[in-house]
Amino acid sequence: SACLVGSEMCIRDRQNELWLLIAMIGDGTRQLGKLHVGDTLNCLYPLGNGFTLPVDPSENMLLVGGGVGVAPLLHLGHEIKERGGEPSFLLGARTKDDLLELDLFQQLGHVYVTTEDDSLGEKGFVTDHSVLKKEKFSRIATCGPKPMMMSVARYAHARGIECEVSLENKMACGLGACLCCCLLYTSP
């Protein structure tokens, strides 16, 4: 049996169903991709704290994801939508083929895209997208590569916008004991 250690994914647990959004990029995620409906799966989840939901569902919240870091934002978007809000997503990837389930995000709210190769949306990184110059967001949640999240956090800090980041690190225990999930930080 394969061990899945700390891969970013979206887990929706509703009405006795477990729904996973994963990118099959390692041994553990490839094993998950081979599962069929009715197969048995031992899970220890949820781990960590997750994102803070907005108190006011009408709050203009931007969910920024890069690479496989977009997966947890899908769950957050569902939670916001179920509370009557309409999330905005800013998703980045190397190419359009690297974007995970774009249509699922589009069902939940506004979706803005950047690709490094200009194959979809605006060319560049998420922090280069024109929506950041046009719209005023009251909160930002981000998940993805560390350099991207640092850029997003700096953008938010410079504008006085509350920003939450979600680590995409490999985390062996998920409980804090092995310290893989610990990160030294300073204000952006």
Task: Briefly describe each language-model feature range.
Residues V5-D39:
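Ferredoxin-reductase
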Residues D27-A172:
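FNR/FR-type flavoprotein reductase catalytic core
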Residues S1-G6, I11, Y185-P188:
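Single conserved hydrophobic/aromatic residue that forms the stacking wall/gate
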Residues C3, C10, D117, C143, ...:
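Functionally engaged cysteine thiol sites
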